[in-house]
Amino acid sequence: MEGAEEKKKVPAVPETLKKKRRNFAELKIKRLRKKFAQKMLRKARRKLIYEKAKHYHKEYRQMYRTEIRMARMARKAGNFYVPAEPKLAFVIRIRGINGVSPKVRKVLQLLRLRQIFNGTFVKLNKASINMLRIVEPYIAWGYPNLKSVNELIYKRGYGKINKKRIALTDNALIARSLGKYGIICMEDLIHEICTVGKRFKEANNFLWPFKLSSPRGGMKKKTTHFVEGGDAGNREDQINRLIRRMN
C-alpha cells in the first residue's frame, strides 16, 4: 500500500539549539582546562613553598652553627666573642597613657601600640632606638629569636587586608598582598621579619599588631625598669621568656 511503509520523518534540530549545545560544550572544555591549570599552579606553588621552607631551615641552622663556631674560636684564643648588633626588636606596650605627654602618645601611635599588651616588630636603627627610649617607661622590649618570631606569626598572626584584620589561615592571602615582593607564604613572611630583609617594611606593615594575653603569673612592677627588677624597658634576649608567657 502506497505510503503505508513510509518512514516517519525525524524533526530537524533547530539551529538555535545546535548553537546552544555547541556553546555549552565549548564552555565545559574551557572550565575543565581552567580547573586543570589551577590544579597544576597549586601543585607548583606547594612544591615551591616546600623548597623555600627547606632552604630557610638550612640557612637558619647555618647561622646558628656559625655563631657557635665563632664563640668557640674566641674562647680558644682567650678572647670574648661579641655577637653582631641585633637588627630586630619586639616591643610590647605594658601601661596605659592617661596624662602622658603628646610626644609619648605620638611615638606609641607610630609604633602601632594603641592598646595595652599590643606587640609589634621594629627594625633597629638610630631613629627607632631613640623612639623606644622616649616611650621606655610604657613598653617592654628586646631581641626576639627565631622561635619567638615563628610562634608569634603562626599563633597570633593577622594580616591587614583591605584595611581589615584577617587571620592568616591560607598562604594565598599572603601571596595576594605580598606576592609582588616575592613573599608568598608564612615561611617567607617569617624569614623576612627574622632576617630584617629588604622588604621588612612591607612585611611588617602587612602584619596587624599582635594582641597578646596578660602574662601568666602577672607582672612585677610596670613602672620600674627591668634592670631594677621591674618590667619596663629593654630586657634584651629575656623578651623571649615574656613572649612565651603572653603568647
From Swiss-Prot:
<feature type="repeat" description="4">
    <location>
        <begin position="42"/>
        <end position="53"/>
    </location>
</feature>
<feature type="region of interest" description="4 X 12 AA tandem repeats">
    <location>
        <begin position="7"/>
        <end position="53"/>
    </location>
</feature>
<dbReference type="InterPro" id="IPR035808">
    <property type="entry name" value="Ribosomal_uL30_euk_arc"/>
</dbReference>
<dbReference type="GO" id="GO:0003723">
    <property type="term" value="F:RNA binding"/>
</dbReference>
<comment type="function">
    <text>Component of the large ribosomal subunit. The ribosome is a large ribonucleoprotein complex responsible for the synthesis of proteins in the cell. Binds to G-rich structures in 28S rRNA and in mRNAs. Plays a regulatory role in the translation apparatus; inhibits cell-free translation of mRNAs.</text>
</comment>
<feature type="repeat" description="2">
    <location>
        <begin position="18"/>
        <end position="29"/>
    </location>
</feature>
<keyword id="KW-0963">Cytoplasm</keyword>
<feature type="modified residue" description="N-acetylmethionine">
    <location>
        <position position="1"/>
    </location>
</feature>
<comment type="similarity">
    <text>Belongs to the universal ribosomal protein uL30 family.</text>
</comment>
<keyword id="KW-0007">Acetylation</keyword>
<dbReference type="GO" id="GO:0003735">
    <property type="term" value="F:structural constituent of ribosome"/>
</dbReference>
<dbReference type="InterPro" id="IPR039699">
    <property type="entry name" value="Ribosomal_uL30"/>
</dbReference>
<dbReference type="InterPro" id="IPR016082">
    <property type="entry name" value="Ribosomal_uL30_ferredoxin-like"/>
</dbReference>
<dbReference type="InterPro" id="IPR005998">
    <property type="entry name" value="Ribosomal_uL30_euk"/>
</dbReference>
<dbReference type="GO" id="GO:0022625">
    <property type="term" value="C:cytosolic large ribosomal subunit"/>
</dbReference>
<protein>
    <recommendedName>
        <fullName>Large ribosomal subunit protein uL30</fullName>
    </recommendedName>
</protein>
<keyword id="KW-0689">Ribosomal protein</keyword>
<feature type="modified residue" description="Phosphothreonine">
    <location>
        <position position="16"/>
    </location>
</feature>
<feature type="repeat" description="3">
    <location>
        <begin position="30"/>
        <end position="41"/>
    </location>
</feature>
<keyword id="KW-0687">Ribonucleoprotein</keyword>
<dbReference type="GO" id="GO:0000463">
    <property type="term" value="P:maturation of LSU-rRNA from tricistronic rRNA transcript (SSU-rRNA, 5.8S rRNA, LSU-rRNA)"/>
</dbReference>
<feature type="modified residue" description="Phosphotyrosine">
    <location>
        <position position="138"/>
    </location>
</feature>
<dbReference type="Pfam" id="PF00327">
    <property type="entry name" value="Ribosomal_L30"/>
</dbReference>
<feature type="modified residue" description="N6-succinyllysine">
    <location>
        <position position="126"/>
    </location>
</feature>
<dbReference type="InterPro" id="IPR036919">
    <property type="entry name" value="Ribo_uL30_ferredoxin-like_sf"/>
</dbReference>
<keyword id="KW-0597">Phosphoprotein</keyword>
<dbReference type="InterPro" id="IPR012988">
    <property type="entry name" value="Ribosomal_uL30_N_euk"/>
</dbReference>
<dbReference type="Pfam" id="PF08079">
    <property type="entry name" value="Ribosomal_L30_N"/>
</dbReference>
<feature type="repeat" description="1">
    <location>
        <begin position="7"/>
        <end position="17"/>
    </location>
</feature>
<keyword id="KW-0694">RNA-binding</keyword>
<comment type="subunit">
    <text>Component of the large ribosomal subunit. Homodimer. Interacts with DHX33.</text>
</comment>
<dbReference type="InterPro" id="IPR018038">
    <property type="entry name" value="Ribosomal_uL30_CS"/>
</dbReference>
<feature type="modified residue" description="N6-acetyllysine">
    <location>
        <position position="123"/>
    </location>
</feature>
<keyword id="KW-0677">Repeat</keyword>
